[in-house]
């Protein structure tokens, strides 16, 4: 694997032999060898001529209408029937938006997790990335709004740019919740969103970003191996955009993406990660990543 998680920072990966943990029974963000985020950040290895090191924050989106439907109907009925529809009487889940509970979840994550992290580090992430799905765009807005409001170095009118990576999406195919709406619709709904503190959220798409979803297929559900390959290509795209100095990185994405990232980074599994939760990883990135191309 070209990228590698570095152990010894968080409860999710204390040592090389660790077999994983259940996030419902453990504080998976616990700092195991450092008193706070600043001390942890300062302990991340310095860049060398061969490797760079990044603090990667992976935020799972809050509860979407599809997540609520899974709780309502059960996974068996969801997979067999409801996932193939675009919604029910409780809401639509084609490229699902967040439920009111989902918005509340990620607001609390912003106030209770991201804000203390940013305050202790004394800075916002150097670069923000996101999945293109609407539940992730809404999660970024709702979770980072309270952080931006409390960050004096970010005055009203500041543009906050988030780079969209099309490949870092949830498992593709069959389930309509994972089909992206037209690009123009998402832009109309979310581009240049004004936060409560007056910051402007700007989504940065590739110049040739497709209007329609070219990845999702109605008759094939992506396998784990297929997703891991796609996710690895997404990680290449992400890390290739970073300079040496851009070390603190945020990605708003999905449970499936997070699990795939963990596998690609040779990181122990994190079980039962709830909607709206955050995972942090120190990542070793080879300097010649850009020369390796896509897989």
Predicted regions and their residues:
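Histidine/lysine/aspartate-rich catalytic loop segments that bind and position anionic ligands
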Residues: 163, 168-169, 179-218
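A short, acidic, amphipathic alpha-helical segment used as a generic capping/interface helix at domain edges
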Residues: 227-244
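Active-site-proximal alpha-helix that buttresses catalytic centers in soluble enzyme cores
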Residues: 1-160, 164, 173, 224-231
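Domain-level recognition of soluble alpha/beta enzyme cores
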Residues: 78-81, 97, 266-292
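Beta-strand elements within well-structured catalytic alpha/beta cores of enzymes
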Residues: 51-59, 129, 246-257, 261
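Active-site signature of alpha/beta-hydrolase-fold catalytic machinery across serine-
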Residues: 142, 260, 264
């Amino acid at each position: 694997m070209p990228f590698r998680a570095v152990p010894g920072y968080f409860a999710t990966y204390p040592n090389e032999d660790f077999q994983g943990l259940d996030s419902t029974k453990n504080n998976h963000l616990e700092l195991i060898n450092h008193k706070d985020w600043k001390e942890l950040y300062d302990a991340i290895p310095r860049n060398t001529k061969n490797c760079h090191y990044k603090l990667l924050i992976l935020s799972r989106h809050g509860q979407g209408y599809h997540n609520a439907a899974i709780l309502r109907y059960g996974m068996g009925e969801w997979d067999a029937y409801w996932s193939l529809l675009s919604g029910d009487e409780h809401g639509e889940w084609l490229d699902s938006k967040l439920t009111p509970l989902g918005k509340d979840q990620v607001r609390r994550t912003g106030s209770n997790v991201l804000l203390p992290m940013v305050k202790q580090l004394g800075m916002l992430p150097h670069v923000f990335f996101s999945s293109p799905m609407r539940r992730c765009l809404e999660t970024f807005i709702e979770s980072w709004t309270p952080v931006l409001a409390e960050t004096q170095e970010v005055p009203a009118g500041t543009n906050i740019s988030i780079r969209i990576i099309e490949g870092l999406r949830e498992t593709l195919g069959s389930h309509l919740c994972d089909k992206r709406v037209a690009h123009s619709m998402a832009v109309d709904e979310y581009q240049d969103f004004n936060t409560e503190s007056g910051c402007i959220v700007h989504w940065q798409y590739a110049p040739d970003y497709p209007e329609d979803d070219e990845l999702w297929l109605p008759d094939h559900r992506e396998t784990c191996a297929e997703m891991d390959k796609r996710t690895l290509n997404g990680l290449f795209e992400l890390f290739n955009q970073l300079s040496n100095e851009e070390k603190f990185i945020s990605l708003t994405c999905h449970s499936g993406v997070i699990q795939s990232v963990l596998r690609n980074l040779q990181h122990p599994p994190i079980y039962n990660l709830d909607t709206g939760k955050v995972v942090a990883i120190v990542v070793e990135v080879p300097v010649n990543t850009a020369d390796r191309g896509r897989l």
